[in-house]
Amino acid sequence: MGRFDGRTAIVTGAAQGIGEVYAKRLAGEGANVVVADLNAELGEQVAKQIVADGGSAIFQRVDVADGASAQALADATIEKFGGIDHLVNNAAIYGGMKIDSLLTVDWDYYRRFMSVNMDGALQVCRAVVPHMRAKGGSIVNQSSTAAWTYSNYYGLAKAGINSLTQQLATELGWSNIRINAIAPGPIDTEATRTSTPQAIVAQIVQRIPLQRMGTPEDLAGLCLFLLSDEASWISGQIYNVDGGQVYRS
């Protein structure tokens, strides 16, 4: 018996990296998983792999910044599985110039960045929460320690995610819907390995008391715990998972 037998979970940004691990772990514990991502090719592969491994999954293409696309995600989930019990808002785009350049930033770029990294979580919640109100549910938002430690668009967006998490926890708790956030530090993913020079990685690791980068698996256990009934009295919390780094910044 798995913790999520008979339940349905949506994971956005699930075509690769952290979201892919979340989706596969949920399926491994019995959930019907909706692999939601803008990248259809990779997302379809993840869903097919879950099914090949004996799990239950479909892929649904979504642009979380678009309300109609988020609604289509919720509708497709209901049509296939009949309900929505869990949501992981993991979709994001990375990068961002320093805050001191905000006065001269390309506004279209800035708005797209924020619409995905901050507004996207709210868009998906707006589409999904009505289907949770009758019997409750749980949500995990993906934040970042960048909300406290870095001055860039990404940190600004993730600070917004933290506030959104706490605001919605207060509002949705009356419907037995819990919402928490995970704030990872530096995580070793394919995207990190291809975009970050090894010399920079070494510098990052030197600042981490536990002396290594995190992995998606380091986050997945907490994510599944927060979604599960084991965390039934936990809501509105932001969990740093960073090897102790944030307290040295």
Tell me the role of every PLM-derived stretch.
Residues 130, 170-175, 232:
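Alpha-helical segment proximal to the catalytic Tyr-Lys
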Residues 2-34:
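Canonical Rossmann dinucleotide-binding motif of NAD(H)/NADP(H)-dependent dehydrogenases/reductases
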